[in-house]
């Protein structure tokens, strides 16, 4: 609604030199641009799936910590799977995710070679996905940070909702007006596509039908 109102207001602005006033001017002029709210939403929300790091200093700090923790985990696990002494013990020299935890794929017969927590196994049972003890603490820190991130996102969305609640009447009015304008323009386009014209009605009530 906010974006549509901004676009509609820009479209509806006209000067005497542009075009003569018409019956839609009153509708366009009744729209209430809520630029402050729109700016705040744009600043905080990148898409329906993503909140901007700049939405709050707290969120930026949390995500920076998450990135650093991720890098530490990957550094340790990459060193582990790249070690020549482990090549025969691993099903693949990769780092994978199981149940939200970073793991390595260990061959069943080498289970005792790696201290850690088993989070999953392959359908055949030949591969165990183990979270090495060396990264358990880091994985725990990452899960905690993910929880804090979600809480902060919910807080940001709550604040935006509160700001929107202060102008809910204006939002409702703008939405109703936009629907009416959309209906009017749809009728106009349909009439243009049909090359239609407005009928002229006689005041005496007589209808002259011509074949």
Which residues make up each language-model segment?
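Alpha-helical coupling/stalk and coiled-coil linker elements that connect catalytic or binding modules
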Residues: 5-6, 15-25, 37-211
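Extended, well-ordered alpha-helical scaffold/bundle regions in very large, multi-domain proteins
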Residues: 27-33
């Amino acid at each position: 609604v906010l974006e549509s109102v901004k676009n509609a207001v820009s479209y509806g602005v006209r000067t005497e030199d542009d075009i003569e006033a018409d019956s839609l001017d009153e509708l366009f002029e009744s729209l209430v641009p809520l630029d402050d709210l729109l700016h705040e939403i744009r600043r905080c929300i990148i898409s329906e799936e993503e909140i901007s790091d700049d939405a709050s200093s707290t969120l930026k700090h949390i995500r920076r910590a998450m990135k650093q923790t991720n890098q530490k985990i990957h550094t340790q696990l990459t060193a582990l799977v790249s070690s020549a002494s482990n090549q025969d013990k691993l099903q693949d020299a990769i780092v994978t995710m199981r149940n939200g935890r970073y793991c390595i794929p260990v061959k069943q017969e080498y289970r005792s070679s790696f201290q850690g927590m088993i989070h999953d196994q392959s359908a055949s049972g030949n591969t165990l996905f183990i979270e090495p003890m060396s990264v358990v603490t880091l994985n725990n820190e990452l899960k905690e940070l993910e929880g804090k991130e979600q809480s902060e996102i919910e807080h940001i969305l709550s604040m935006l909702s509160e700001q929107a609640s202060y102008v809910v009447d204006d939002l409702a009015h703008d939405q109703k007006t936009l629907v009416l304008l959309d209906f009017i323009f749809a009728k106009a386009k349909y009439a243009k596509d049909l090359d239609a014209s407005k009928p002229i009605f006689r005041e005496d009530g007589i209808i002259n039908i011509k074949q």
